[in-house]
Amino acid sequence: MKLERVRAVRKRSRWFDGLLTHNPVLVGGMAIPFAVVITTSLKNSVSISILLACSLVPTVLLASLAGARLPRWGAPILYTLFSLALIVACVPLILPISPEVADSLGIFVPLLSVNTLLLTLCGRYADSRRKPVFALVDAVSYSAGFALIMCLLALLREWLGTGIIWGVPVRAPFTLSGIQITFTGFILLALLS
């Protein structure tokens, strides 16, 4: 009786694991360079979150469907190349946010294809014992958890650092220009953890 109840609770909580309890940035410590460096503006955070979701979900689904048939030494290379192709194809999706956002993200756009979050989830679902539905649920919830933390950090840093949110001046009680530097991103991330 108790085991069935535990399984039912775990099945329901899987939808929220990546958001709160097993957040990839706060709890897992994955993708910290993105959370620290890119979160100086909300446009950058939304853009990188869109690109991560567009690459993470199909790549983890590929790993769950074909991972058991791939050699263990070649699978991470294939996942990285597949993710990079998806990211390059999805860059036009972020250009309507702001024309200069692709330039401001710089090297972090191609680095999305080799981040720890992607390779960890692909490795987890590469064996044939796990169902692709669980891979899809985890990829979506981890993408949403990543986006939530990225946008929260960016909102705090942009508002308190410049008094602007998404290019619109918003009255802030005070502005601290030092909150825009990378070191402060580490401190804010630690406070949220």
PLM ranges: what are they?
Residues 71-83, 104-110, 138:
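Cytoplasmic-side transmembrane-helix entry/capping segments in multi-pass membrane proteins
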Residues 92-142:
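Membrane-proximal helix-loop-helix units in multi-pass membrane proteins
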Residues 1-16:
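Intrinsically disordered, low-complexity non-transmembrane regions of multi-pass membrane transporters
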Residues 59-72, 119-130:
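C-terminal ends of transmembrane helices
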Residues 13, 132-193:
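C-terminal transmembrane helix-loop-helix hairpin of multi-pass membrane proteins
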Residues 64-78, 98-103, 166-176:
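Membrane interface segments of multi-pass transport proteins and intramembrane proteases
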